[in-house]
Amino acid sequence: MYSSAWAVGEALDPTVKRFAERRTVAEIDWTAWRAADPATLVFVRRADELLLIRKKRGLGAGKINGPGGRMEPGETPAECAVREAREELGITPRGLRWAGENRFQFVDGYSIHVHVFAAGGFEGSVRETDEAAPLWTPVDRIPYDEMWQDDRLWVPHLLAGRRFDGRFVFEGDSMLDHAVELL
């Protein structure tokens, strides 16, 4: 179930919340838009398999996705992607490549800007943690029905090596509108 980080009592900055209640991508001035949270996702590929996780807690708990999470102050997106893979799976991604970015606006006011990375390998042993259960998935059988609705719109570009820029509007777990451009 969807839950935003600020719902526990943190107040959203008014400049971040100003696009709350917008229900289409066209209603948002993306040049002025700012995310409440910068974050990353990293997808490790091994031959014809993709390393995914089933999230155990936080935003997207119960869903399948790539490892990732919110950036810490002073951290670059690449540093965050590596840290999150270590925390969630016990591995260090290698051959990290920036693949694209996705901007998400939720109608309740929460927003997140996700930098997406692809990795051609990793060091360490993949293990389950209290945050995530790992699963290697054949690239021709990605479990989109168990993922966020937007994933089926940009993950194929990631797998094909194409860079992308996505913008999405969500109400809870439901995607209301989207736009994905190739870079």
Each language-model region and where it sits:
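Unchanged
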Residues: 71-95, 103-158, 176-183
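N-terminal amphipathic/basic-hydrophobic helices that include classical n-h-c signal peptides
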Residues: 1-21
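Short, charged/polar surface micro-motifs in flexible loops or helix N-caps
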Residues: 45-49, 120-125, 161-162
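Charged phosphate-binding loop/patch that engages nucleotide di/tri-phosphates or the phosphate backbone
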Residues: 4-9, 160-183
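A positional/architectural concept
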Residues: 61-63
